[in-house]
């Protein structure tokens, strides 16, 4: 279901020179709908220069039941991030989808775990919520954060992380690595990559001791970190990645199908609708939107999983997938923004969100 609500901006706070935190006021009747699992994101919708824009931003905190916050960092050519910095102000309203995504972790009070987070740049946004909630909810658990930035001045949530370290001095290990700032220790200088993690593993951290690892940041860093953690002994199933979409980047077509004129049945809100694809490379989502369907989506790059649906009948191929887990694929879930029909009897269900 596409569920947007108009939320009022309670405050806009500067985090760094190019990043702001936007806090929305959530009225009491909607607070249950906006209850989130740490690591999930919000999809924001706004009109900019006559065009509707949608972007996903990780929930970074929610100190009160009536508030929820996301952080927006400016990126080169990013229209929504520019809109956020130049136009979003306290008191205005914005269309905000209910929390989505399955990255992260739901803390459990009785659990005693050791967790690792590796982040670079704005990749810290989902980690802040995960770390803060876990340390608060699981009094016997420990967290290590490896956080990479260019300099200390470009570091998002610097004060919030310092406050967490002061609050949990024995349970939070914070390692800040800077690529453009000279430090006494070479170990904390440079970029987070496979070599850096190998060095940390040889002298400071035993990666095999962690129960779960969470990674978020630039694609190259994430790929290096995932490979390094596996080489250092962490099982695949304990490593979780959250990829941010890069606006303007188009994935090269890897699926060659003939779908021009193909009909697909789309089920949403309990109703079936027949759509027709008008090009071999048109996704099910694009075809449905072109024909007036109001389906959930955000990145259109196979990253955020907002457009996830379930194939009830027929066969579908996906061009790329950065967000669905193997068990979701086995259960028949696909990303409609990447889905191309392979047969003439395809039925997809957007109401089936049971594994979200």
From Swiss-Prot:
**Pathway(s) per entry:** Aromatic compound metabolism; phenylacetate degradation
Query: Which regions span the lipid bilayer?
Result: none
InterPro entries annotated for this entry?
A: 2Fe-2S_ferredoxin-like_sf, 2Fe-2S_ferredoxin-type, 2Fe2S_fd_BS, Beta-grasp_dom_sf, Cbr1-like_FAD-bd_dom, FAD-bd_FR_type, Flavoprot_Pyr_Nucl_cyt_Rdtase, FNR_nucleotide-bd
Name of the top EC class for this enzyme: oxidoreductase
Q: How is the cofactor bound?
A: Binds 1 [2Fe-2S] cluster.
One biological process term from GO is: phenylacetate catabolic process
EC number from the UniProt entry: 1.-.-.-
Q: Where is this region: Oxidoreductase?
A: 112-228
Name listed for the protein in its UniProt record: 1,2-phenylacetyl-CoA epoxidase, subunit E
Q: Which gene encodes it?
A: paaE
